[in-house]
């Protein structure tokens, strides 16, 4: 969330609509001061609507935590139409201000030509250690019609977690949304073509490639004005870490206060067509970090009482039937229960890669 060096709270607007039949989300929060940068302040109770240039209007439903959503059955953006976001603060801000975006045209975006990965050698094998490998995920796209010159991508990673012990919650899945700003300008290129563009790098410092990994990428089209906005935001985020770290209030978005044009409003209302592609990686990579190497902390006979079992101590190996019998304990819950990092609910798409084989 953007952070500013002002005592007065300002409205922050984040969200977008697309041409897909899906739920679109607009999030409203209040800007935070320097000393409260980790405090997110959702704005509830506002009246949020979207209208187009044909005088159609849709009222968004409040879904909690500052989120306002469209009805996936009744709203779908149309390429070529212009959309305007309106926010009635409904008394949540002084003077009962209302806010409005500039009309935003929903621009087309080309299909994703290819999404693929490459194995990368991070450190070569030596007599003392095995090689360390990672993975680069790349994308190709082009637009012969030249209707899209400014691109933006985001993605969601999902990977399988398998504990090395036979415990009840052994297999889980977890997901992570991209936090970096990923954009590309082709307006100055001789051809509107993007080849081998790096989306993500998965290093050996994570276990994401240990079993099975998937990445879903979304491709969007931007106006030149929105590209300039994200380009400025990218420069700021490179200095501070990610999009969710400090963002100075000097980056002007496309939303304004009707009653007071000098009132500063943060964030951007994005409008774009969307194309998606998913990739699966189920290969063996050398030298990945072992997150479970320090799991065992004690070995006891099976008849010995275990104080705080299930609260601060867990059994990861039950060798009660072995000779001699034993149990191995850990003081790290994540070694005995994969739900510490994920969920046991299998993603509905997890076997989609096998359908094409």
Predicted regions and their residues:
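A sequence/structural signal for flexible, mid-protein segments enriched
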Residues: 1-357
């Amino acid at each position: 969330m953007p952070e500013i060096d002002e005592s007065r709270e300002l409205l922050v607007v984040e969200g977008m609509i697309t041409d897909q039949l899906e739920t679109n989300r607009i999030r409203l929060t209040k800007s935070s001061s320097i000393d409260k940068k980790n405090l997110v302040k959702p704005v509830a109770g506002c009246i949020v609507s979207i209208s187009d240039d044909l005088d159609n209007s849709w009222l968004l439903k409040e879904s909690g935590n500052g989120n306002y959503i469209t009805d996936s059955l009744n709203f779908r953006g149309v390429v070529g139409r212009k959309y305007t976001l309106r926010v009635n603060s409904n008394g949540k801000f002084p003077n009962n201000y209302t806010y409005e975006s500039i009309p935003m045209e929903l621009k087309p975006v080309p299909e994703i030509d290819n999404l693929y990965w490459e194995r990368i050698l991070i450190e070569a094998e030596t007599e003392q250690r095995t090689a360390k490998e990672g993975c680069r995920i790349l994308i190709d796209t082009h637009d012969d019609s030249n209707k899209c010159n400014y691109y933006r991508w985001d993605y969601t990673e999902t990977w399988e977690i398998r504990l090395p012990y036979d415990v009840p919650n052994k297999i889980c899945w977890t997901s992570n949304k991209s936090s970096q700003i990923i954009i590309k300008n082709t307006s100055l290129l001789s051809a509107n073509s993007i080849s081998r563009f790096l989306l993500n790098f998965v290093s050996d410092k994570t276990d994401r490639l240990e079993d099975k990994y998937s990445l879903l990428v979304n491709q969007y089209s931007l106006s030149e004005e929105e590209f300039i906005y994200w380009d400025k935001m990218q420069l700021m985020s490179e200095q501070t870490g990610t999009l969710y770290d400090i963002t100075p209030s000097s980056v002007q978005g496309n939303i304004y206060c009707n009653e007071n044009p000098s009132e500063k409003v943060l964030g951007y209302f994005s409008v774009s067509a969307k194309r998606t592609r998913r990739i699966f990686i189920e290969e063996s990579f050398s030298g990945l970090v072992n997150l479970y190497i320090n799991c065992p902390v004690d070995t006891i006979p099976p008849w010995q009482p275990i104080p705080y079992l299930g609260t601060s101590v867990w059994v990861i190996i039950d060798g009660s039937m072995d000779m001699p019998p034993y149990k191995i304990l850990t003081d790290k819950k994540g070694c005995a229960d994969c739900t510490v990092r994920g969920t046991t609910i299998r993603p509905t798409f997890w076997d989609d890669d096998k359908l094409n084989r």
